[in-house]
A protein has these predicted regions:
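Terminal or standalone catalytic/regulatory effector modules within metabolic enzymes
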Residues: 1-153
Length: 153
C-alpha cells in the first residue's frame, strides 16, 4: 500500500489526503472483481480434511460452484481454484482480525497469493472469519484472473 500511495503522491506532485488513501485502499484491495463474490459456502470436516462447496458470482454473472478438499477451508478453496483455473496458486501471506470485542464483531482477512511468479493481494470484510478468509482469497484470485486476461489480450 505504501508504494501505491507514494506513486500517487509523486504523480500529483505532493501529499495526498486520507480520503484519497482510503479510495486507493478500497479500489486496490477491498473491491471484489466482477463474478468473484462469495455467495455461500458449505464445509464438511472428515477424516481426509475439509470438503468445501463454495458458490461465487454476482448480479452480472451466473453462480459458479467450486468444490475442493484441503486441510481447512482456505486449502479447500485453493485446491478448487487451482483445478478450475489450471493454476498452482499459493497463499504467501494470510492474516485475520476481529473488528470488535464481542461475538457480533465483524472480521477482516488480508491475503497475498502467488501464481507463476505474479502476486495479488486482497482484503475482505465479513460477518465471520471464514467468510472473510474465503472472500479475500476469491478477490485475490479474481484480480489474478483479470491480470492474466489483460496480458493475453
Amino acid at each position: 500500500m505504501a508504494k501505491l500511495v507514494q506513486s500517487d503522491a509523486e504523480e500529483d506532485g505532493g501529499e495526498i489526503d486520507s480520503r484519497r488513501v482510503h479510495q486507493r485502499f478500497n479500489s486496490d484491495y477491498l473491491e471484489v472483481p466482477n463474478g468473484w463474490t462469495l455467495r455461500s459456502y458449505d464445509l464438511h470436516r472428515g477424516e481426509e480434511g475439509v470438503q468445501a462447496q463454495i458458490s461465487i458470482g454476482d448480479e452480472r454473472s451466473p453462480v459458479t460452484v467450486l468444490s475442493g478438499r484441503g486441510e481447512g477451508a482456505v486449502g479447500a478453496l485453493v485446491e478448487a481454484l487451482n483445478r478450475r483455473q489450471g493454476w498452482q496458486l499459493q497463499v504467501e501471506a494470510f492474516d485475520e482480525y476481529s473488528l470488535g470485542d464481542n461475538t457480533e464483531a465483524n472480521a477482516m482477512a488480508c491475503v497475498r497469493v502467488q501464481v507463476g511468479g505474479h502476486t495479488q493481494s486482497a482484503v475482505a470484510l465479513a460477518a465471520d472469519t471464514t467468510a472473510a478468509a474465503l472472500q479475500a482469497i476469491l478477490s485475490a484470485a479474481g484480480r489474478m484472473a483479470e491480470a492474466q486476461a489483460r496480458k493475453s489480450a
